[in-house]
Regions:
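Core segments of cupin and vicinal oxygen chelate
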Residues: 3-48
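Vicinal oxygen chelate
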Residues: 5-9, 66-110, 115-121, 135-138
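Short glycine/proline-enriched turns and hinge-like loops at secondary-structure junctions
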Residues: 27, 57-60
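Acetyl-CoA-dependent GNAT
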Residues: 47-51, 116
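Short beta-strand/turn micro-motifs at beta-sheet edges
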Residues: 51-57
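A short, polar/proline- and glycine-enriched secondary-structure boundary/capping micro-motif
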Residues: 56, 122-125
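Short, solvent-exposed beta-strand edge segments and adjacent coil->beta transition regions
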Residues: 61-65
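Short, solvent-exposed cationic patches
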Residues: 126-138
Length: 138
């Protein structure tokens, strides 16, 4: 996935310093490729389009949000602490099949950070358990 961003440095600080992505390569201040695991060249590309680029229109077709799967529940709790510390936590939810946090990157792209719920809690019952409930973080 490649996201268009206004400011590469600001976006890099968010994805690298807060979300833990690593720089895989850069293209002369135009594009940065980031990896989450190091197992492939990149999981996310950031393409600079400039400070005057308009924001996406919420009611237009296009990307709703980016969902990034974290390793486990402990990783979600760590992400909650980091986002809360920086005032970037927009919401959280227990979806029955997953546990999710919501934030936005510097350009307003909504980001969901989640881990799957244990399979035995939902397998074969997704249509009855998939919901939006408050997320208990204790």
């Amino acid at each position: 996935m490649v996201l268009k961003v206004r400011d590469l440095d600001r976006s890099l600080a968010f994805y690298r310093d807060l979300l833990g992505f690593r720089v895989a390569s850069e293209m002369s201040n135009v594009m940065i490729f980031l990896t989450a695991t190091g197992e492939n060249h990149h999981d996310l590309g950031l393409l600079r389009v400039g400070d005057s680029a308009p924001s996406p229109i919420p009611t237009a077709v296009g990307l709703y949000h980016v969902a990034i799967q974290l390793a486990d529940w402990d990783a979600v709790k760590r992400a909650h602490a980091i986002l809360s510390e920086h005032g970037l936590l927009r919401g959280s939810a227990d979806h029955g099949v997953s546990r999710s946090l919501y934030t936005a990157d510097p350009d307003g792209n909504e980001i969901e950070l989640y881990c799957d719920a244990p399979r035995d809690e939902w397998e074969g019952r997704v249509d009855t358990v998939m919901t939006v409930r408050p997320l208990a973080l204790d």
